[in-house]
């Protein structure tokens, strides 16, 4: 029932808040979670795939949704591939997601700013490659 689903979601959120991403007075979040959001792999629309299976209802990308913690997508590069449609080298984004304790969105923004200042990652600009700086045609 809906009531059971809400109870399960609340239990999961409380567990994450109490055991995984705990609020810390000095650092805001006592830990960070990092997972690959997009690995830059192709997924052609004109390819036949296996039929859908039974959904599990959960993946790493659902932690934020079910617990209410921030999930920040951070583009870190791009992967080249030869398109079987255009027969040219094209690029797909590669990104990681960073999770922190509830209410620590600002801490993640600060971390990203520090990484840009240190030259670890590039600042992003809509419509341009984060690696080469070239304009991307959509």
Enumerate the language-model features and the residues they cover.
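Structural helix-boundary/capping segments
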Residues: 67-138
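Serine-dependent amide/ester hydrolase catalytic core
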Residues: 1-62
